[in-house]
Structures are given as C-alpha cells and as structure tokens.
A protein has these predicted regions:
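GHKL-family ATP-binding catalytic core of two-component histidine kinases
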Residues: 70, 91-93, 125, 170, ...
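Short-chain dehydrogenase/reductase
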Residues: 101
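Short, well-ordered beta-strand segments
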Residues: 75, 91, 115-117, 123, ...
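Catalytic nucleophile serine of serine hydrolases
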Residues: 81, 96, 121, 221-223
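Short Pro/Gly-enriched coil loops immediately N-terminal to beta-strands
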Residues: 247-249
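Short alpha-helical segment within the catalytic ATP-binding CA
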Residues: 79, 127, 172
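Adenylate-forming
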Residues: 9-37, 104-111, 123, 136, ...
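Carrier-protein-dependent adenylate-forming modules in NRPS/ANL systems
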Residues: 1-98, 106-109, 115, 134, ...
Length: 249
C-alpha cells in the first residue's frame, strides 16, 4: 500500500457500484496480490501492472525493508461512498490509526473478557476499529453475517449468543435496534458508540431506559482523520441536553 497504489483483497461490495471501480482505474496503478497461483492465470489482458505471487506472509525483518517504517507512513486508504460526488480516497497514517486505537482503549478499558461486534461494511471507516481494536488487549472479535447490521432481531440474537459487550451504530439503526431490543438478551453490552448522524435527546433517553447499565458514547470524525476526532459520554441525568460532539480525543 502506498500513495500511488490501491491494494484490494477479497471482493468489492455490489453496493459500491461502478463509480468507485472507475475512479480506482483512473487514479491508481493496479496491483494484484495473489497468495497461490493456479497453473494458468489470465493476466495479460487484465490491466494489472504487477502481480505479486508466492510471497512469504511471515514477519518482515527490519533488515529486509527498503526504508525504515515511520509513524507518518500510510496505514490504509478508505474510499467514501461518493454520495456527494466522486468517491475519494481518505489516506490515514500509522500514527493516526494507532492514536485512535489507544484512545478507544483509554475510554473503554477493554479486557480479554470483552467481545466486540464487527458488523460495519468494510467500505466505512468504523469497520477499521471494529476489527483492529480487539488486537490491543486481546479481546474477542465477533463477526456478524453480511447485512446482519440491518436486522435488529438478528442483532439481539447474536449479542445474547456471543455475549457482545461493545458495538457501534448510526443513530437511525440504533433507534431500530432499541425499538426491538430485548433487555434480557442485551445484558452483556457495556459500551454503545454512535456516529455518522446527530444523536437526539429522545433516542438517548430510550437507550438508557432499555439498557440502563450501558455506557453511551457520541463520537464524531471524518474518514480523513482516522475515524473519530471528538467524543462525548452521555449521562442518564442529562435528559434535556442534546448530546454535543464533545471534546478532542
């Protein structure tokens, strides 16, 4: 991964459409990463400039690197939906990504007993911390089925079956989840983070009514800034306070 390369692994979601693919083709070189090649692979007409095959997936020693790793080196590029125009790549550094992870650990205080639900599409920045945050403290990663985030009944079931303790919602989906929530099935929830839309007073009250023991966090940040830049912990007694975006992380 680098400033002039886009590396893709796995499939590209249908929901992204052709706009993102055409943007990639226009603005970046193509590099296909293939672990095991079949005897024949038709790549001559595929438009790839390079094909990396048969690489050792083990740890790369410092002596093997062309240049040393730096905190400002690229960690990942994530593409916006393009809902307001052409999709654009948001490049985030190693330093920004790690800073975000350590901040989340500071406020959530995760342990090996926690279980984080990964349900956000990989095309959205929230997914980055959902699957990488468990690595900070050895927490367990629980992976939802594709499109499971759209089904409140399914979410109730997986939360209860897997004892999920940390999860993220956009307020619209949080509202649907709370409306369908079975309190007895959600006793394991310690932290709910909400982002992507404004969190209103009625929804805040509903969360505390249904899940009085859960911590509710209102977080805000653009994809270009490693996901979150401000946060606010909602309190049950703040019934008349519209949750602000809060303080810098």
């Amino acid at each position: 991964v680098g400033p002039s390369f886009i590396m893709t692994t796995g499939s590209i979601e249908d929901a992204l459409g052709s706009g993102l693919l055409s943007y990639w083709e226009e603005h970046a070189a193509s590099l296909s990463s293939v672990g095991v090649l079949p005897e024949r692979l038709l790549v001559d007409d595929a438009g790839f400039r390079d094909v990396v095959s048969g690489y050792d997936a083990g740890v790369i020693a410092a002596s093997e690197r062309i240049t040393p790793l730096q905190p400002d080196h690229l960690a990942y590029v994530i593409y916006t939906s393009g809902s307001t125009g052409t999709p654009k790549g948001a490049a985030n550094s190693q330093l920004g990504t790690i800073n975000h992870m350590f901040w989340m650990q500071d406020i959530l205080q995760l342990t090996e007993e926690d279980r984080i639900l990964h349900k956000t599409s990989l095309s959205f920045d929230v997914s980055v911390w959902e699957w990488s945050l468990p690595l900070i403290e050895g927490s367990c990663l629980v992976i939802a089925t594709p499109d499971g985030h759209r089904d409140p009944v399914y979410l109730n079931r997986i939360i209860q079956e897997q004892s999920v303790s940390v999860l993220n919602f956009v307020p619209t989906m949080l509202s649907s989840f709370i409306d369908a929530a079975v309190p007895e099935a959600c006793l394991s929830i310690r932290h709910i983070l909400t982002s992507g839309e404004a969190l209103g007073i009625p929804l805040q009250e509903s969360v505390f009514e249904v899940l009085p023991d859960a911590h509710l966090w209102n977080v805000y940040g653009p994809s270009e800034a490693s996901d979150d830049v401000t946060y606010w912990r909602c309190q049950p007694e703040d019934k008349d306070l519209t949750p602000p975006i809060g303080s810098p992380i």
